[in-house]
Regions:
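Binuclear metal-ion centers of metallo-dependent hydrolases, dominated by the metallo-beta-lactamase
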Residues: 9, 96-103, 107-172, 200-201, ...
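Core dinuclear metal-dependent hydrolase active-site scaffold
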Residues: 1-66, 138-210, 281-286
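Thr-Gly-centered strand-to-loop micro-motif
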Residues: 44, 190, 216-218, 241
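Active-site environment of divalent metal-dependent phosphoester hydrolases
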Residues: 27, 48-50, 76-82, 108-112, ...
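Stable alpha-helical elements in mature extracytoplasmic
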Residues: 50-54, 80-83, 121-129, 189, ...
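Active-site metal-binding motif and surrounding structural segment of the metallo-beta-lactamase
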Residues: 38-39, 49-104, 204-221, 234-239
Length: 286
């Protein structure tokens, strides 16, 4: 049976203050796709403190020592690549899994709002991860398709022209945006994509964006989103890798009237089912 697993990260259980004064707590994100023949595609994985539990979840969905065909890192923030980093750099964890390819693309010409070029260090770190795991690097091209058994990954976006994203935020705007077409369902992954990224994808692909499942960008927070993109995807199932406090804040009077909060609310209301990661690890049949 093909299935998608949304992992309940440890930080998704955060239930404290969440506002502009204390900051927005990073919830983390991790997904596993199991194909018909039990091949594995992994997306992100959460923070370093998720490494043991996330690896155990991978093992539970494999026959024997797991072989991950593709481990996709959407962007180099620690609540997304932290688990993979910890696994790679901890010999007893690394020995428990074989990773064939790590998929990532961190353009070094990208400049953050604060002037930093954080992707330079991120790429250096990824070289270490590749060396420790023995995995091959796969830097996807625009519109590239990769098939793993019964699932086809279609890369819709990477930061191919940093001039349109330089200076507007941090490396969230470098997130890969891609779909996974399984036998009966199609999933849209957005990582922590910014509104501008979603606008570009909508411009490039238009009506071809229709999917059954949508992962809301940046933990369903109101600093991103795009109504026309959500309407084009028109997903019946919405995935929210968010924390308790973040979800509560986005639906409170503090944030719920913000334009992008309303756009995210549209995606939720348009769906038949919304899965929030803090509610627990969940499996969805594909």
């Amino acid at each position: 049976m093909e299935k998608l697993i949304q992992y309940c990260t440890k930080e998704s259980l955060y239930d404290g203050a969440f506002n502009g004064k204390v900051g927005w707590h990073a919830a983390g994100m991790g997904y596993i796709i199991v194909t018909e023949e039990k091949h594995l595609i992994v997306i992100d994985g959460g923070n370093a403190n998720d490494s043991e539990d996330f690896l155990s979840l991978i093992e539970a969905n494999a026959d024997g020592k797991p072989v991950v065909d593709l481990w996709i890192i959407t962007h180099p923030h620690s609540d997304h690549d932290g688990a993979l980093n910890r696994i790679a750099k901890t010999p007893e964890l690394c020995a428990r899994v074989e990773i064939r390819e790590i998929v990532y693309r961190f353009p070094e010409e990208f400049v953050e709002r604060n002037g930093n070029r954080s992707n330079v260090q991120a790429n250096a770190n990824m070289e270490t991860v590749l060396s420790l795991t023995g995995a091959k690097a796969h830097c996807p091209e625009l519109d590239e398709k990769v098939t793993v058994d019964s699932a086809t990954v279609h890369f819709l976006y990477y930061p191919y022209d940093c001039r349109i994203i330089n200076g507007i935020a941090n490396c969230n705007v470098c997130s890969l945006i891609f779909t996974v077409q399984a036998k009966n369902k199609k999933i849209m992954f957005t990582g922590d994509a910014n509104t501008r990224n979603l606008q570009v994808v909508k411009w490039l692909y238009g009506k071809d964006l229709k999917c059954d499942i949508l992962q809301l960008p940046h933990h369903a927070l109101c600093d991103t989103g795009h109504l026309d993109f959500y309407k084009a995807v028109d997903a019946a199932i919405v995935l929210e890798p968010t924390c308790i406090a973040g979800d509560r804040a986005m639906h409170s009077d503090l944030y719920c009237t913000a334009e992008r909060a309303r756009w995210n609310a549209f995606a939720e209301e348009n769906a038949a089912k919304v899965y929030k990661s803090y509610e627990g690890t969940v499996e969805i049949e594909l």
